[in-house]
């Protein structure tokens, strides 16, 4: 028995000691070396005896015995014959398990090209031979000959010959040359490749060539050839002569009842190959006619293709049921493939699932577990306890007792469960809070009870949701569950750092009701000794809950030394608030409780508690708040009745007025005064305004009521209307929903997003008529359809994000960089979108922050900014801070803790080993389902914002203009002549309060540096037309303005004024094509006037559609408009919103009509125009001018002679992130992506920290393109990981060589995932075949750095608790002699069973996981 145990141990010790996985091409010899014998027959098993046929696909001699330790003929049975090979049937006596890993092989009668290297684009064989895929296919499938050895003839190598040409050549030259057909020909060509010589030639060619396309092509080919050279793969191995056969247990054949068999598709495919191969061998032996042999070879090629990748070429081979057979490639790719189905996600034992119900009496760390479930889940633990106590003699007896559910079993179950945490998971697990640990409480019934406060994290409700339970078995797993996953340790959300354990719904309503005050309630004005007395008064009915009273409150406040000091004061409060104060922990101020508590206030309260008192107190407080909230929600008796929906009296009046206005607009339309579009927009604006007015009247009506106070005078107070209370507290519902209940439903949208102009004037209390109901079905159904689509899309986005960021882990404490990104408050228009304190909270300062206006250091470099520092920033009114960021972090693999900053879910500097990439991906993906799917049309209600025509400031302060060029008109007002001018209002402390974009041609009433008062209008402009502003005074002279040729005259019927409209180039007659209509300004003598400060003449070219109202020779003053260009195109552009917008940003997609940016700084001019385009020329102060062709229909933001800076917008449109990166750098593109993504989430009210988006941006920027390689290992134009270039450059700097020059490249997340260094990770993501093909040809090595790779090979991940294990491994690798010491104590660590124990209990087998975890624990000890 002893040696059996040793033998078993040896068997289980798998080859786990590798650090790299290399993939390559298998040579024929390699395949033979794996093989245990050749499969010669297509037979599988004998259908009578069910024994495998000899030499067949399931042959026991090749693949091993069918029964454990028993040969096929039955001569040798039992363990004692282990290792004997039976002389009769030739089967080795061993475990059946070997049938899972012993391979066979098939000797192919002729070579066959591997379809992956042929058809997976770009074709590797094609690339290496430099032949088109078409040609190679014609050779392979026997349509043409290829010349393999031209000899002395005038044929060329690799030349294709048709049958006729081949015969002609043979007649002409005899056997001077060699030409072959089929895979043999291709193999011969590949074998003759001289890689070194080819590489040298390519390098020379690369030096000489100038054409960009040729360069790219050569680089591609060169990379492939070099990969072949370095990896030791030989090109001819891409053509197979030996085919490996998968072990039989991986392609099983199972007899069903009724004499039929269920089989894996692979067996059919292998059978086909063997049949054809054998037939071909026979034909070759018989020396059959060429055409027959060829046909057979072609069929063999096709059957091998189908085996490897069915359906890749031609039609897929189908089985008996018309379904394509599942080939080897299909086994590994896709959601059901090996990677995603079995390696990345496995099903686990010790789990159960059930419906969830509420457990309002539980503590936060508890959950209710049905007894039945617990008994089943903790079975083994119960068995072992029963046995060790001597209650049951054997495991079998224990099993019986448990099945009979004897009373003692329940006692033992309770003991086992004590302090054994379990994991609860609700699908879909969108972020890490979707799995949390709880301590089980045994309950009757069959539903799991869940604590109400963790519902937000799980996104659970109790309308039938189910949850899964998992039991952590090993000590280590229990430890992790308790220390890291316990619900009490996850109070803050990792996405935003705000509390996620926040009361909602009933609890909020209860607390809100409890803390409201009421005028003249019973007991008003009483005095109480302490909150206990106030409660007594309430319980005995002496005072109402809402009564305003004075209570003596004892607060415990921290003093300077940090000790709690008691302070007692008599304070104004209400009974309810005093009662609530009784649950407050010491150290919280009373003012936090002494207010009406809505949802936001409660969230703040818990946050405050967490920051002041720490985790434990906050969790206790949260629980107490919940119990109190439920109790008082029940007492409040708040409910919804139809009379609570009070319809405002003014409603009918408002609607009547709106209808009258609409009728008036319709009149105007009928008489032709307004266009159809204008009428539609105006009607929608009227109804939107009416809706607002009704809503306002309704809310005023609902939210306040008039009561008589103690003095007998009327006084307004907030109403106790149930519906209003629910919305006001944030418990349920919103003003928008109440508006539909008691106001009017308003405008509805069609499914395409356009707004129906007849609104629904009724509300739900009045009820809708048929027409109104019909209109509203549109929106409702669209909502449902959207939701279904949204879930799938959001899940896919999350998957892509996780994939791109999965290997980003905190690997060191400080990378030492001085770089960072500059943070300022986000201000749009007159309101601060996000204050500076919120943006820098939890970040590390990159360089000293100085006190504004002095040289004194306020915050030193490398300080982590916490709440206290934020107060300092506010007090000193700092408005710009440079903070460290993940994007600028210098760590090679991973990120450093200082560049990341605070761990949002814990509130301190992040620990090493934290998987920040995955957290970022989850934080961005999880709210994805809340984002909308639709694209917004600016139309009607939405366009109110777009049509601004003036700026009215909200704060007093000083005006500051940036990027401003202007002229002063005769009234002394300033007229802007620059494009992207920004107007900022700065307060007395120098803080930016407001920020506006001002368009070209706006008239400003204040200059730079002027003071403004609140509500002053500082700028106005015409929103519908863009003027052309004259920068000088003079006389107008028309140039190229010819009636009927370049312009048309229009006379306005109403006013009788005539104007000239410039025609578009496309609409002009041929004679007018080259004319360029312009207005020139001349002085009295007719000479050109120069624009001040330049030597450019003042002439203004007019684009198509421009309207000129002045006549030739008219006098004009400076700052007046020469012409106007109508801006009608603005109203129709779609704004992509919601989820698709986020996906577009992360995929770095180029928009349809991207903004055109200036590539260099210089002066703009226009060159010769072509048919549909105009030529833009930018001439810099020195160096080459830059030319670009721009389509005519693009509206340009620049006139001729204007000066632009590199990266300025020349033509409006959506900016392309690639352009921003190229022209403005990494910081600008980070800013752009972060702000754009945040914009979408902010609209939905979702809070995500910028850090997470930056993490993804870092991953999108991890590749660079080499622009100057010097003599390094890189090629120019090659795409390389930035970290690799940096490492190489550090080395080169030490050697004093010039540094390799590179440009950062922005990749979309899908591209970036596929371009990762690790081929295992890329293959398990998408396009498995392509990734594996590429990796195999290049002989890639996977260093197993990321998380996915390690999960796939079954290791601990190099993050979290596995981080130490991997560091220990790395240490061990560098000092091999200590390896023994590291391995030795493994067995003792967990007190694993000794040999004797195993003999007694033969059923127990230790698995690898427990061993590796034990090793992990030791790794920690050793360090």
UniProtKB/Swiss-Prot annotation:
Subunit structure: The RNAP catalytic core consists of 2 alpha, 1 beta, 1 beta' and 1 omega subunit. When a sigma factor is associated with the core the holoenzyme is formed, which can initiate transcription.
Gene behind the chain: rpoC
Residue numbers binding Zn(2+) 2: 815, 889, 896, 899
Cystine pairings recorded for this chain: none
Official protein name in the record: DNA-directed RNA polymerase subunit beta'
Alphabetized InterPro entries for the sequence: DNA-dir_RpoC_beta_prime, DNA-dir_RpoC_beta_prime_bact, RNA_pol_asu, RNA_pol_N, RNA_pol_Rpb1_1, RNA_pol_Rpb1_3, RNA_pol_Rpb1_3_sf, RNA_pol_Rpb1_4
GO cellular component, one term: DNA-directed RNA polymerase complex
Keyword field contains Transferase: yes
SUPFAM superfamilies in alphabetical order: beta and beta-prime subunits of DNA dependent RNA-polymerase
Cofactor note text: Binds 1 Mg(2+) ion per subunit. Binds 2 Zn(2+) ions per subunit.
Positions annotated to bind Zn(2+) 1: 71, 73, 86, 89
Class of enzymatic activity (EC top level): transferase
Family, similarity comment: Belongs to the RNA polymerase beta' chain family.
């Amino acid at each position: 028995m002893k040696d059996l145990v040793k033998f078993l141990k040896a068997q289980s010790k798998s080859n786990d000691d590798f650090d790299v996985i290399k993939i390559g091409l298998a040579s024929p010899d390699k395949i033979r070396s794996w093989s245990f014998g050749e499969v010669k027959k297509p037979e599988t098993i004998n259908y009578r005896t069910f024994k495998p046929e000899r030499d067949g696909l399931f042959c026991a001699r090749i693949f091993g015995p069918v029964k454990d330790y028993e040969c096929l003929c039955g001569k040798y049975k039992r363990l004692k014959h282990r290792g004997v090979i039976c002389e009769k049937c030739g089967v080795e006596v061993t475990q059946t398990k070997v049938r899972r890993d012993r391979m066979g092989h098939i000797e192919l009668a002729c070579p066959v090209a591997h379809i992956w290297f042929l058809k997976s684009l770009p074709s590797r064989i094609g690339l290496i031979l430099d032949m088109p895929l078409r040609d190679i296919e014609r050779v392979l499938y026997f349509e043409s000959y290829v010349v393999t050895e031209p000899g002395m003839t005038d044929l060329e190598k690799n030349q294709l010959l048709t049958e006729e040409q081949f015969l002609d050549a043979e007649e002409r030259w005899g056997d001077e040359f060699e030409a072959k057909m089929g895979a043999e020909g291709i193999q011969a060509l590949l074998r003759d490749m001289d890689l070194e010589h080819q590489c040298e030639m390519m390098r020379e060619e690369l030096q000489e060539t100038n054409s960009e396309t040729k360069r790219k092509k050569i680089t591609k080919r060169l990379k492939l050839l070099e990969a072949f050279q370095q990896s030791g793969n030989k090109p001819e191995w891409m053509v197979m002569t030996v085919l490996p056969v998968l072990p039989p247990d991986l392609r099983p054949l199972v007899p069903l009842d009724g004499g039929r068999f269920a089989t894996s598709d692979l067996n059919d495919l292998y059978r086909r190959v063997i049949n054809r191969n054998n037939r071909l061998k026979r034909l070759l032996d018989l020396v059959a006619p060429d055409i027959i042999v060829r046909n057979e070879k072609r069929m063999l090629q096709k059957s091998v293709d189908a085996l490897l990748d069915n359906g890749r070429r031609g039609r897929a081979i189908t089985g008996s049921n018309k379904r394509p057979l599942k080939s080897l490639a299909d086994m590994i790719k896709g959601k059901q493939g090996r990677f995603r189905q079995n390696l990345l996600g496995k099903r686990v034992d010790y789990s159960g699932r059930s419906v969830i119900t509420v457990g309002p009496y539980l503590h936060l760390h508890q959950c209710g577990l049905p007894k039945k479930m617990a008994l089943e889940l903790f079975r083994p633990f119960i068995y072992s306890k029963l046995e060790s106590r001597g209650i049951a003699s054997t495991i079998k007896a224990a099993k019986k007792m448990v099945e009979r559910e004897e009373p003692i079993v329940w006692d033992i179950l309770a003991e086992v469960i004590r302090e054994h945490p379990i994991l609860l998971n609700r699908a879909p697990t969108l972020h890490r809070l979707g799995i949390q640990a709880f301590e089980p409480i045994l309950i009757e019934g069959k539903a799991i009870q869940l604590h109400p406060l963790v519902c937000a994290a799980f996104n659970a409700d109790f309308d039938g949701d189910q949850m899964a339970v998992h039991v952590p078995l090993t000590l280590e797993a229990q430890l992790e569950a308790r220390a890291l996953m316990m619900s009490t340790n996850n109070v803050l959300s990792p996405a935003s750092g705000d509390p996620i354990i926040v009361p909602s719904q009933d609890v909020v309503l209860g607390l809100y009701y409890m803390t409201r005050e009421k005028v003249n309630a019973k007991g008003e004005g009483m005095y109480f000794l302490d909150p206990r007395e106030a409660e007594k008064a309430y319980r005995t009915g002496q005072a109402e809950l809402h009564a305003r009273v004075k209570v003596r409150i004892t607060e415990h406040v921290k003093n300077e030394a940090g000790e709690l000091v008691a302070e007692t004061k008599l304070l104004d409060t209400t009974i309810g608030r005093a009662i609530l104060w009784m649950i407050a922990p010491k150290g919280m101020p009373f003012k936090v409780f002494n207010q009406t508590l809505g949802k936001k206030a409660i969230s703040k309260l818990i946050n405050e508690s967490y920051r002041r008192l720490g985790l434990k107190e906050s969790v206790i407080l949260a629980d107490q708040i919940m119990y109190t909230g439920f109790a008082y929600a029940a007492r409040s008796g708040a409910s919804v009745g139809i009379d609570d929906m009070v319809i405002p009296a003014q409603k009918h009046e408002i609607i009547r007025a709106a209808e009258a206005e609409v009728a008036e607009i319709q009149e105007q339309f009928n008489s032709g005064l307004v266009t159809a579009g204008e009428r539609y927009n105006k009607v929608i604006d009227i109804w939107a305004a009416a809706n607002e007015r009704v809503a306002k009247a309704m809310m005023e009506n609902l939210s306040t009521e008039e009561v008589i106070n103690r003095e007998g005078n009327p006084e307004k107070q907030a109403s106790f209307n149930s519906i209003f209370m629910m919305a006001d507290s944030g418990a349920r519902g919103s003003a928008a929903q109440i508006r539909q209940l008691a106001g009017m439903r308003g405008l509805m949208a069609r499914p395409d997003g356009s707004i129906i102009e007849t609104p629904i004037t009724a509300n739900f209390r009045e009820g809708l008529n048929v027409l109104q109901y019909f209109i509203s079905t549109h929106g409702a159904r669209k909502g449902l359809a959207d939701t279904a689509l949204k879930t799938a899309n959001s899940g896919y986005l999350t998957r892509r994000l996780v994939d791109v960021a999965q290997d980003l882990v905190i690997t060191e404490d400080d990378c030492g960089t001085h770089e960072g990104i500059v943070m300022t408050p986000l201000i749009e228009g007159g309101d601060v979108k996000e204050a500076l304190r919120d943006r820098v909270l939890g970040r590390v300062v990159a360089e000293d922050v100085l006190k504004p206006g002095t040289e004194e250091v306020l915050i030193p470099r490398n300080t982590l900014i916490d709440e206290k520092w934020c107060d300092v920033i506010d007090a000193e009114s700092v408005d710009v801070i440079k903070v460290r960021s993940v994007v600028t972090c210098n760590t090679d693999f991973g990120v450093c803790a200082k560049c990341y900053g605070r761990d949002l879910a814990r509130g301190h500097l992040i620990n090493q080993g934290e998987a920040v990439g995955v957290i970022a991906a989850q934080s961005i993906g999880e709210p994805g389902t809340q984002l909308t799917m639709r694209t917004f049309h600016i139309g009607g209600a939405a366009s109110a914002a777009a049509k601004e025509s003036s700026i009215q400031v909200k704060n007093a302060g000083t005006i500051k203009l940036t990027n401003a060029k202007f002229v002063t008109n005769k009234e002394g007002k300033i007229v802007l002549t620059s494009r992207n001018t920004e107007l900022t209002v700065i307060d007395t402390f120098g803080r930016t309060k407001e920020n506006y974009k001002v368009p070209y041609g706006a008239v400003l009433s204040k200059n730079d540096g002027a003071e403004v008062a609140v509500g002053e209008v500082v700028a106005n402009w015409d929103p519908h037309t863009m003027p052309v502003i004259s920068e000088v005074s003079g006389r107008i002279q028309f140039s190229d303005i010819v009636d009927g040729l370049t312009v048309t005259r229009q006379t306005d019927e109403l006013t009788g004024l005539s104007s000239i409209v410039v025609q578009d180039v496309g609409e002009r007659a041929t004679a007018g094509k080259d004319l360029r209509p312009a207005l020139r300004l001349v002085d009295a003598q007719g000479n050109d006037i120069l624009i001040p400060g330049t030597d450019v003449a003042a002439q203004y070219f007019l684009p198509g559609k421009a309207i000129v109202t002045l006549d030739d020779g008219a006098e004009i003053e400076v700052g007046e408009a020469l012409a106007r260009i109508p801006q009608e195109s603005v109203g129709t552009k779609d704004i992509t919103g919601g989820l698709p917008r986020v996906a577009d940003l992360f995929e770095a997609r180029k928009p349809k009509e991207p903004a055109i940016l200036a590539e260099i700084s210089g002066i703009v001019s226009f060159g010769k125009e072509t048919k549909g385009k105009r030529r833009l020329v930018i001439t810099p102060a020195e160096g080459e001018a830059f030319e670009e062709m721009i389509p005519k229909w693009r509206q340009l933001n620049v006139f001729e002679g204007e000066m632009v800076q590199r990266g300025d917008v020349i033509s409006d449109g959506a900016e392309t992130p690639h352009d921003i990166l190229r022209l403005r750098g990494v910081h600008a593109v980070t800013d752009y992506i972060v702000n754009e993504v945040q914009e979408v989430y902010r609209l939905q009210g979702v809070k995500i920290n910028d850090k997470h988006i930056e993490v993804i941006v870092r991953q999108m920027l991890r590749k660079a393109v080499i622009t100057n390689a010097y003599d390094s290992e890189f090629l120019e134009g090659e795409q390389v990981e930035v970290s690799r270039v940096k490492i190489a450059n550090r080395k080169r700097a030490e050697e004093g060589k010039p540094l390799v020059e590179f440009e950062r490249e922005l990749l979309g997340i899908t591209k970036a995932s596929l371009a990762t260094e690790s081929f295992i990770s890329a293959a398990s993501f998408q396009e498995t075949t392509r990734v594996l093909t590429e990796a195999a040809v290049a002989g890639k090595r996977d260093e197993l750095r990321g998380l996915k790779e390690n999960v796939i090979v079954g290791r601990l991940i190099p993050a979290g608790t596995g981080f130490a294990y991997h560091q220990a491994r790395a240490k061990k690798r560098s000092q091999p002699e200590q390896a023994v010491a590291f391995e030795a104590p493994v067995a003792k660590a967990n007190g694993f069973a000794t040999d004797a124990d195993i003999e007694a209990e033969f059923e127990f087998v230790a698995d690898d996981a427990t061993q590796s975890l034990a090793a992990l624990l030791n790794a920690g000890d050793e360090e």
